[in-house]
UniProtKB/Swiss-Prot annotation:
The gene is ureA. CDD domains: Urease_gamma (cd00390). It is an enzyme of class 3 (hydrolase). GO terms for biological process: urea catabolic process. Pathway: Nitrogen metabolism; urea degradation; CO(2) and NH(3) from urea (urease route): step 1/1. Pfam families: Urease_gamma (PF00547). This is Urease subunit gamma.
Length: 100
């Protein structure tokens, strides 16, 4: 199997998000990379499912809460930008203050 660099990056996000979700299910609070991985993964999958950019931008701030992450992580992430593949092409999804 030969994957392009962009596909490898997407696969890495999936693996990182899966690991982060497993840790979260064990009751651990997420660190910065884990929180980014989960938010990124959910936005990419939402785009793949056909949700609109506007919908993802508002929904993206509900994926994780301050209670889900370690102290200070929410303050470190002021914005998440994901280049996601939609049914009609690739678009940039920006979520401001994604952890509330």
């Amino acid at each position: 199997m030969h994957l392009q660099p962009k596909d490898l990056e997407k696969l890495l996000v999936v693996v990182a998000a899966d690991l982060a979700r497993r840790r979260q299910q064990r009751g651990l609070k997420l660190n910065h990379p884990e929180a980014i991985a989960i938010i990124t993964y959910e936005l990419m999958e939402g785009a793949r499912d056909g949700r609109s950019v506007a919908d993802l931008m508002s929904w993206g701030s509900t994926i994780l809460t301050v209670d889900d992450v370690q102290e200070g992580v929410a303050d470190m992430i002021s914005m998440v930008q994901v280049e996601a593949t939609f049914p009609d092409g690739t678009k940039l999804v920006t979520v401001h203050d994604p952890i509330r």
